[in-house]
């Protein structure tokens, strides 16, 4: 009896028909592959990419030189030098360097910052040809912040209820 059932299956090509049906379903399904350099997939609002220093809407930098990010960095990739106190009692940084070679993109610096000055932005395309280009100074970080501010502000606003 089993041999008759086996013969019927092979004669009717049931496996072939089911495999062909599966192939046709996949053929007409939407593409799951992206052509990367030309198409980019969605990035989570919590994505931790290239670092940036933010400014207030009036153009003043946010960093108050509290050095919490430098203290919490497990890779010791951040170096900060604070300037003298200003007339209003606040301080600003004279030097703010991040060694991106050491950075492990943990996001602790962003979490520790009381004024949301240092953030990890949405940019993931920052490959370089030399190692020296991965040592970010204050000017580079502020330029990143100016360039990505709209997306950074949107991502922080989306994540605000969970902070």
UniProtKB/Swiss-Prot annotation:
Name of the protein in question: NADH-quinone oxidoreductase subunit I
Family as reported in the entry's similarity comment: Belongs to the complex I 23 kDa subunit family.
A Gene Ontology BP annotation from the UniProt entry: aerobic respiration
Gene Ontology CC terms: plasma membrane
Alphabetic keyword roster: 4Fe-4S, Cell inner membrane, Cell membrane, Iron, Iron-sulfur, Membrane, Metal-binding, NAD, Quinone, Repeat, Translocase, Ubiquinone
Localization (cell): Cell inner membrane
Top-rank EC class of the record's enzyme: translocase
Bilayer disposition of the protein: Peripheral membrane protein
Binding locations of [4Fe-4S] cluster 2: 73, 103, 106, 109
The protein's required cofactors: [4Fe-4S] cluster
InterPro entries named in the record: 4Fe4S_Fe-S-bd, 4Fe4S_Fe_S_CS, NADH_quinone_OxRdtase_chainI
Role, per record: NDH-1 shuttles electrons from NADH, via FMN and iron-sulfur (Fe-S) centers, to quinones in the respiratory chain. The immediate electron acceptor for the enzyme in this species is believed to be ubiquinone. Couples the redox reaction to proton translocation (for every two electrons transferred, four hydrogen ions are translocated across the cytoplasmic membrane), and thus conserves the redox energy in a proton gradient.
Keyword Repeat: yes
Reaction it catalyzes: a quinone + NADH + 5 H(+)(in) = a quinol + NAD(+) + 4 H(+)(out)
């Amino acid at each position: 009896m089993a041999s008759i059932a086996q013969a019927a299956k092979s004669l009717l090509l049931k496996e072939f028909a089911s495999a062909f049906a599966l192939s046709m379903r996949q053929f007409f399904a939407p593409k799951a592959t992206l052509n990367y350099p030309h198409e980019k997939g969605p990035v989570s609002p919590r994505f931790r990419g290239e670092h940036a220093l933010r400014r207030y809407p009036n153009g003043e930098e946010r960093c108050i030189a509290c050095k919490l990010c430098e203290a919490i960095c497990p890779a010791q990739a951040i170096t900060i030098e604070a300037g003298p106190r200003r007339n209003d009692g606040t301080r600003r940084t004279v030097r703010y360097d991040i060694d991106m070679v050491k950075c492990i993109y943990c996001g602790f610096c962003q979490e520790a910052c009381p004024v949301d000055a240092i953030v990890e932005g949405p940019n993931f395309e920052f490959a370089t040809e030399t190692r020296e280009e991965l040592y970010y100074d204050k000017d580079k970080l502020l330029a990143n912040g100016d360039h990505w501010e709209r997306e950074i502000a949107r991502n922080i606003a989306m994540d605000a209820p969970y902070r």
